A protein has these predicted regions:
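Primary recognition of N-terminal secretory signal peptides and signal-anchoring hydrophobic helices
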Residues: 1-194
């Protein structure tokens, strides 16, 4: 009786091991790079098709991604946001000297805004990942409706003074937020301090 149980257990383990090997050959991990940056999640290769978690790409794509389960529909909304920085003399710039204090504002042109948003903001992140908010608008602001009731609008931030004390890449980012959702990165520009 004991021998019979041992044979059955050995066969079960052998079959399980074979199934794992077969499954490993059917589904292989795929490393995903977007603009030479590795995604936080790997994809899977199944029958020569790559499957990825699209939500993990929302910041890379700089888009709103929404899964509507009841409709079996994936919706990707990508507003166009073009930003540039202007000094107090209204001259555009994208490079600064390390250690310089700059007074500037951010100009943003937004179009193809086909989703309702409750807030937007502009941030600047230094090479050490310390982020400051340059300007923001939300539904509580009197002028918010003039920006977001159209699918196209222009935005000028307030004039700010900022110390570019570190050498490296500073990230100028434009975020939008939908109702009951986290802020979503929509656009990013790089300012280099040398």
């Amino acid at each position: 009786m004991m021998r019979k149980k041992l044979v059955i257990l050995s066969m079960a383990l052998l079959l399980a091991g074979g199934s794992i090997v077969a499954a490993d050959k059917l589904m292989q991990k795929v490393t995903l790079l977007y603009n030479n940056k590795q995604s936080s999640e790997d994809g899977l290769l199944v029958d020569d098709k790559v499957y990825i978690n699209i939500r993990s790409l929302s910041d890379s794509l700089q888009a709103f991604i929404q899964w509507k389960g009841s409709e079996k529909k994936l919706v990707i909304q990508k507003p166009n946001v073009h930003m540039f920085m202007m000094n107090e003399k209204r001259t555009m710039f994208g490079q600064v000297e390390k250690g310089s204090v700059q007074k500037f504002l951010v100009q943003a042109q937004i179009d193809n805004l086909n989703v309702a948003i409750t807030e937007f903001k502009v941030t600047l992140t230094d090479p050490n990942d310390k982020e400051i908010t340059i300007d923001r608008r939300s539904q509580a602001d009197d002028d918010f409706k003039e920006f977001v009731e159209k699918d196209t609008f222009w935005f000028s931030s307030k004039l700010v003074s900022y110390d570019f004390k570190y050498a490296g890449r500073y990230k100028l980012r434009f975020w939008m937020e939908q109702k009951n959702a986290e802020p979503q990165l929509i656009s990013e520009k790089i300012i280099t301090a040398k």
